[in-house]
Amino acid sequence: MKLSRRTFLGQTSLATLLAGVPAWARAAAQQSVESAGQDAGGGIVNFAITPEPPVLVSFANTSGTSVTVSSKVVEGLLEYDRQLTPKPQLATAWEISADGLTYTFTLRPAVRWHDGEPFTAADVIFSLQAAKKYHPRGSATFANLEHIEAPDPLTVRLRLSRPAPYLILALAAGETPILPAHRYALDEALQNPLNSAPIGTGPYRFKEWVRGSHILYERNPDYWLEGHPKVETLIFRVMPDSAARLNGLKNRSIDIGSNSPIPLSEVPRLKEFPHLAVSTDGYEDNATITALEFNLERENLANPLVRQAIAHALNREQIKKIAFYGYADVTVAPISRRSFPNYHLDIADPYPYDVERANRLLDEAGHPRQAGGHRFALNLHSNPFNPGFVRTAAYVRSALSRIGIQVTLHEQDPGSYIRSVYTNREFDLTVSGVSTMFDPTVGLQRIYYSKSFNPAIPFSNANRYHNPEVDRLLEAAAVETDDGRRAEQFKAFQEIVVREIPTIALAQVHGVTVYNRRLSRFDETAAGTRGNLALLDIGNA
């Protein structure tokens, strides 16, 4: 068999990736990829992912890779453009009543599941019930959902007890996937084998998952969007090593990787490889702000003068440069400017970089320098999920040493980090990500709302912050249907937390996608590569 350069490189890369995988799995993986190459006639896209997802359907697991692989097979009612405006997917039209309590969706006709059965309103009803019961955010997102009905097979009506203005933004494939009701039972949904071999309505059909190696999807020839997808074979390659991902992109055996697939320090060197390009679009529904969070149960950190001093000691421009190599925007407020310009509070930093001021505030707070110049010591736990958080933590340690605060860094695996910070509350400071997600009520209420504090739930009010006015504003915004009034509520909330700083917002991180220039139309929605990639196109590079 004559091998093209692309096929040869792809197979060479696969052999490297499968070192340590059992022989039978290596053989199966090699055979499947060779077959895909023969059948596709060049219409193959290799997508690097890490870590390997635990499941391939995102209704009960919202890890980044689960969402990425799920949404190609299992779709949502809606998708969203980069301004977070709803667009049709499995629903072609929708109407929200004036009181915000009734949502009516018209479903796309003549859509079939990959097993040939018709898609109907029964699938939507089951899927929303499953999301409310099993999704990590489902009980909150659908808390006000009282009743679902189907007036006919292509109409679904939701009835709410109270308005939920964020609900219309929660219906993407990655957040609320629509599952085949005829293949699931609600009480056994988590154990269904289809979670690892999904059947959906999407542009790609599941073919195989060789654990530790790859997930292989093929084009759905019966997809409802005529002429799409154009890609014949989509292969998600599990590549935990960043050097391997970088080399794969360079040698063309990998076509694309998202969520900063290579060290950001390497991005400037990509100009040496003209077939590669970088995009920061397609992350608008999951904007992450790097933040320094305080444990307000610590006596010294409960003192606002100490928190103000720490804020004055931090140079956001340096963090942008050192921790994120420029792929970030400095910010003071916790709501993303890029994703929610109407909700973002554009405010001057009340605690600008000023080391002299920081030192004076610590003296005023009753923490004079002792022998050796030290005032007191703190521990700092860095969230391991993003290398930029770890680099930010190192910068914070250095910056605080200049004002006499001795910081001990704790770098841990994800499980240990969650136990130390959220379960056992052993931290003084933590550098982590605060995400507005697809709506501030969903993303930020868990961080700043006093009733969100729960040591059993990670990433929920680690500060143990309590401000009655903040609670009131967040509660009001959660049910406000007038967007202008809702914006005022969110801005008033930000005004308070920017001045009280239970958390110091530092920089909004840019998601980075590295891709072969032959690819296009993968970053046109707010979800980007986490969307269904139905429009993904292949040219030459």
Per-range role (PLM):
Residues 48-98, 126-129, 140-142, 199-201, ...:
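N-terminal lobe/hinge region of extracytoplasmic solute-binding protein
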Residues 81-85, 172-229, 233, 356-360, ...:
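Gly/Pro-rich hinge or "lid" segments in bacterial periplasmic/extracellular proteins
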Residues 106, 140-184:
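Surface-exposed binding/hinge segments that line
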Residues 147-149, 207-218, 235-298, 317, ...:
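Extracellular/periplasmic solute-recognition and catalytic clefts
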Residues 211, 258, 340, 363-437, ...:
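Ligand/substrate-recognition segments at binding pockets and active sites
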Residues 305, 320, 406-418, 423-425, ...:
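Extracytoplasmic/peripheral linker and loop segments enriched in polar/acidic and small residues
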Residues 330-365, 384-392:
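Structural transition elements
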Residues 513-541:
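Long beta-strand-rich cores associated with HINT superfamily self-processing modules
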